[in-house]
Design a protein with these regions (language model features):
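Transmembrane alpha-helix boundary/anchor motif
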Residues: 23-27, 31, 156, 185, ...
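Helix-start (N-cap) segments at beta->loop->alpha junctions
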Residues: 59, 143-145, 153-173
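Juxtamembrane segments flanking the first transmembrane helix
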Residues: 1-105, 163
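A short beta-strand signature within small-molecule sensing/ligand-binding domains used
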Residues: 131-141
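Cytoplasm-proximal transmembrane signaling helix
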Residues: 165-190, 196
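Glycine-rich acetyl-CoA-binding "A-motif" of GNAT/NAT acetyltransferases
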Residues: 148
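Extracytoplasmic/periplasmic sensor domains and loops in membrane signaling proteins
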Residues: 70, 94-133
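Membrane-proximal alpha-helical signal-transduction linkers
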Residues: 193-212
């Protein structure tokens, strides 16, 4: 019976490890990814809001030129490792840091809808079919005389966020492995302090009962 109890204890130890691994691989990836998305979106939205109130806002009050804003946003886009756009409410692309200025050829984003965020300030997707893969997109309105004149839109590749997520997941797996190894101490203590002495006592009792 004591041997059966010990085997059950070992089985419980391995079940703990299996369930810990299942929980980490099932729940942690989505939780980590959502956290990174929200964190990145918040950071980009702060930048977009700043741009809307300074560089981009100056375009609609004739305080600066399109060329000047383009140069400033190009540098900022490199720093943020993102693509920055200024888009009119109609969907007409005013400026794109990934493309040179071309005022003669008007680019319109089909089906552009600034309300797609549904009360939030970011979305994840291909941005109305503009990208081949998913991007994280944040919107910040450009206002003048209490009217929305356009939007500062910042895109960042979801692959970069996924890479960060994978790095954090590797840390989670390593942490789980360390906890599993540390919990082995409990098994060792149980074996040395409880199981082995109990087995010796049981053996001695059996020998005494047998007249030895």
């Amino acid at each position: 019976m004591k041997k059966t109890l010990y085997l059950k204890f070992i089985l419980a130890y391995f079940i703990f490890g299996v369930f810990g691994f299942i929980i980490v691989t099932t729940f942690v990836p989505n939780m980590t990814k959502e956290h990174l998305i929200r964190e990145k979106a918040e950071s980009l939205y702060s930048e977009a809001t700043l741009i809307a109130g300074t560089y981009a806002g100056g375009l609609y009050t004739s305080e600066t030129t399109l060329e000047t804003v383009k140069m400033q946003l190009d540098s900022l886009a490199v720093y943020l490792n993102s693509e920055i756009r200024i888009i009119n409410p109609s969907g007409r692309l005013v400026l794109d840091t990934n493309s040179p200025l071309d005022v003669e050829n008007v680019v319109v984003i089909e089906n552009f809808d600034s309300t797609v965020t549904s009360g939030s300030y970011y979305i994840v997707g291909d941005f109305f079919g503009n990208f081949d893969s998913d991007v994280l997109t944040v919107f910040a309105p450009i206002t003048s005389n209490y009217k929305v004149k356009g939007y500062v839109v910042i895109h960042t590749d979801m692959n970069d966020i996924q890479k960060s997520c994978n790095s954090l997941l590797n840390i989670s797996y390593i942490t789980l492995a360390i906890l599993f190894l540390l919990s082995l101490i409990i098994l060792i203590f149980f074996t040395e302090i409880v199981y082995i002495p109990l087995r010796k006592i049981t053996h001695a009792t059996e020998q005494y009962a047998a007249g030895n």
